[in-house]
C-alpha cells in the first residue's frame, strides 16, 4: 500500500513590528505573499528591557506597561493582517535585544520560512536591524531575508505579487 503524501507545510512570512514608517511596506508585502501562495503571516514585537530599575515594583510596573503597549500594537497589526489575508497571524512577543531575539525565534520556530523587513529610504542606512543582519546576522539566519523599500506604495507592492 502506498504511503500518503505529507501535506506541504504552509510558508510563514515573519514581520518585525516596530514604530518605523517602513514597517507598513514589509507587512503589506508579507500579506500579499501569504495571500498569493496560501501562507501565513507571523508578527514579532520585541520589548526592550528597562535600562535600570530603582525598585522592583517600579520595574515590574514598567514591564507590565511595555507588555500592554506591545499587545495593543500587535492587535492593530493582527487586524490588518486578517483583513488582507483572511487568516489569523501568528503572534510573538519577546523581551530582550531585538537582534538576538529575532535570530533565536527564527532558529526555534521552524515554520518560519522568510523574514520580511522594511528598508528606511529617507536616511543613509536601511535601518539598524537590516544593517546588523547584512553585516553579522545573515550568517546566523536560517531563512531568506526580503528587504522591502519603504517608499513603495501599497499599489506598487500589490503589482509585484
Predicted features and spans:
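Gly/Ser-rich helix-loop-strand patches that form or flank binding pockets
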Residues: 1-3, 106-161
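Small/aliphatic-rich secondary-structure junction motif
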Residues: 3-57, 140
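Short, solvent-exposed amphipathic alpha-helices that sit
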Residues: 29, 65-77, 101
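Acidic, proline/glycine-rich short linear motifs
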Residues: 45-72, 155-161
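A short helix-to-beta-strand connector/capping loop
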Residues: 84-90
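Charged docking surfaces used in two-component/phosphorelay signaling
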Residues: 93-101
Amino acid at each position: 500500500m502506498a504511503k500518503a503524501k505529507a501535506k506541504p507545510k504552509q510558508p510563514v512570512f515573519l514581520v518585525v513590528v516596530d514604530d518605523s514608517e517602513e514597517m507598513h511596506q514589509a507587512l503589506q508585502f508579507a500579506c500579499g505573499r501569504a495571500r498569493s501562495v496560501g501562507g501565513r503571516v507571523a508578527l514579532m514585537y520585541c520589548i526592550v528591557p528597562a535600562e535600570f530599575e530603582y525598585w522592583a515594583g517600579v520595574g515590574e510596573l514598567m514591564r507590565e506597561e511595555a507588555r500592554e503597549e506591545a499587545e495593543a500594537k500587535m492587535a492593530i497589526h493582527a487586524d490588518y493582517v486578517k483583513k488582507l489575508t483572511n487568516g489569523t497571524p501568528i503572534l510573538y512577543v519577546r523581551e530582550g535585544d531585538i537582534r538576538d531575539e529575532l535570530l533565536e525565534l527564527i532558529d526555534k520556530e521552524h515554520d518560519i520560512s522568510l523574514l520580511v523587513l522594511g528598508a528606511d529610504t529617507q536616511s543613509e542606512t536601511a535601518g539598524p536591524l537590516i544593517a546588523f543582519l547584512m553585516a553579522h546576522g545573515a550568517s546566523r539566519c536560517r531563512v531568506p531575508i526580503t528587504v522591502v523599500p519603504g517608499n513603495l506604495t501599497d499599489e506598487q507592492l500589490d503589482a509585484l505579487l
